[in-house]
């Protein structure tokens, strides 16, 4: 009987999706499932909902156990075959709010702030110390487990685990799975969805759709470029930044336009405020999204707990398919975030890259991609520089390394002076209190 440990099980909606998928999978439906969180109330909510799915969808075959608090973490992990990570250190309040409000005082605006930008840097710096604790426990009580990381900032957290721990780690993101489908649907090319072939590689949230053909092998990019240019010229829509990537760089990118607007110095510029409207960029999008999600979940939770009629159908989420492939040996292809062991020739070896991977009984096996077009590798490098420096800061615990990471972050460096970057970092660290007290 496999054991699956879910770290951050208070993330009820995501835990429901991943673990509900496992209950719908023959190789996993009788698993022992350990639910771990530091929030007792949210943990109990997840346990109630997952227990209902187990009864209604799985005939009660899975064994669910809860573990609350750091003092019970080792037991939650003991003997695990798979560890799913979905923690958020500092929650929406106070930490996400701080990550947006303090930079605003310096004139630095953000959209999502969970992957790059000063918000992404701060999120990594308060999360990596927690992952260090996880890693020590995993190395002792479940050393053969696969660590499936879903927490952002993906490249920084997964890269840290891959470089500095003995834990078998892969980072997983939805954006690879939805990239070409969203592109073709947005351009009215739904007739090309079936049988399409694609190659995606780069870094998390900035991986590139390098090739896309129809079922007969015909290149779809010429028509994509024509339609994307026409749509950007004709109307406001939610994907204008990525369509501009197609125009200027020649390729489409995995993650959404609201994300990519803040990964470079090109779109959110205090000197050119008209660009916000021109590219339909939703500033402060993540806080709005969090508020709506919290409200929506409260309503959904009340309905679920009232009638208990919750069931589940297996989704396209990677996690259960990865576990199934490793346990059964039946191969499955994913886009995974792994250490760049010669996979992308013109990105550094220390980088965490997102490439096609084949999963089977031997584990997660990344595929060699070769060289990216120069302009795409250069765009990736602007992000990788900040990622690597942030990991270094998390290792050294030195504030001067945090300053360096922020100075290398493209959007931050384009908007602020060095002195203001240092002041902003100090103010953020102080505002985060105990979450970042280790940085001296």
Task: For every predicted segment, state its role.
Residues 80:
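An anion/phosphate-binding loop that grips the pyrophosphate of nucleotide cofactors and donors
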Residues 64-77:
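Short acidic low-complexity segments
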Residues 24-27, 51-55, 76, 140, ...:
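Short, surface-exposed basic-aromatic patches at helix termini and helix-loop junctions that form
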Residues 24-60, 73:
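Glycine-rich phosphate-binding loop and adjoining beta1-alpha1-beta2 segment
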Residues 188-440:
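Long, compositionally biased stretches enriched for glycine and/or charged residues
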Residues 93-163:
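Rossmann-fold NAD(P)-binding glycine/threonine-rich loop
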Residues 16, 146, 150-216:
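Rossmann-fold dinucleotide-binding core
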Residues 4-29:
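N-terminal Rossmann-like dinucleotide-binding module
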């Amino acid at each position: 009987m496999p054991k699956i440990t879910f770290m951050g099980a208070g993330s009820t909606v995501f835990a429901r999706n991943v673990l509900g998928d496992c209950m719908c999978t023959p190789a996993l439906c009788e698993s022992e499932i350990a639910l771990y969180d530091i929030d007792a109330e949210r943990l109990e909510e997840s346990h109630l909902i997952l227990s209902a799915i187990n009864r209604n969808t799985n005939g009660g075959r899975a064994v669910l156990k809860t573990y609350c608090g750091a003092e019970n973490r080792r037991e939650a992990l003991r003997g695990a075959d798979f560890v799913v990570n979905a923690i958020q250190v500092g929650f929406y309040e106070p930490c996400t709010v701080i990550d947006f409000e303090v930079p605003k005082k310096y004139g630095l605006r953000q959209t999502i702030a969970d992957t790059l930008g000063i918000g992404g840097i701060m999120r990594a710096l308060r999360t990596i110390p927690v992952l260090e604790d996880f890693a020590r426990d995993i190395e002792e009580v479940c050393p053969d487990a696969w660590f499936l990381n879903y927490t952002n900032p993906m490249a920084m957290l997964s890269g840290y685990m891959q470089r500095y721990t003995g834990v078998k780690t892969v980072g997983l993101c939805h954006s690879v799975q939805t990239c070409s489908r969203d592109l073709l649907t947005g351009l009215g090319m739904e007739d090309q969805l079936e049988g399409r072939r694609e190659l995606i590689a780069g870094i998390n949230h900035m991986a590139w759709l390098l090739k896309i053909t129809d079922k007969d092998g015909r290149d779809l990019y010429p028509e994509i470029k024509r339609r994307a240019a026409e749509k950007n010229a004709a109307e406001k829509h939610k994907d204008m930044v990525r369509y501009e990537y197609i125009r200027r760089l020649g390729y489409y990118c995995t993650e959404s336009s609201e994300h990519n607007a803040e990964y470079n110095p090109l779109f959110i510029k205090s000197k050119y405020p008209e660009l916000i409207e021109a590219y339909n960029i939703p500033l402060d999008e993540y806080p709005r999204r969090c508020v709506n999600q919290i409200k929506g979940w409260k309503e959904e939770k009340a309905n679920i707990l009232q009638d208990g009629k919750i069931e589940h159908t297996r989704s396209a989420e990677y996690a259960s398919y990865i576990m199934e492939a490793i346990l059964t040996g039946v191969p499955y292809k994913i886009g995974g975030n792994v250490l760049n062991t010669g996979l992308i020739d013109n990105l550094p070896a220390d980088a965490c890259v997102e490439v096609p991977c084949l999963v089977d009984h031997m584990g997660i096996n990344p595929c060699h991609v070769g060289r990216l077009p120069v302009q795409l590798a250069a765009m990736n490098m602007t992000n990788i520089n900040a990622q690597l420096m942030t990991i270094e800061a998390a290792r050294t615990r030195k504030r001067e390394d945090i300053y360096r990471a922020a100075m290398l972050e493209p959007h931050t460096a384009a908007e602020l002076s060095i002195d203001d970057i240092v002041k902003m970092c100090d103010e953020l660290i102080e505002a985060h209190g105990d979450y970042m007290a280790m940085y001296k």
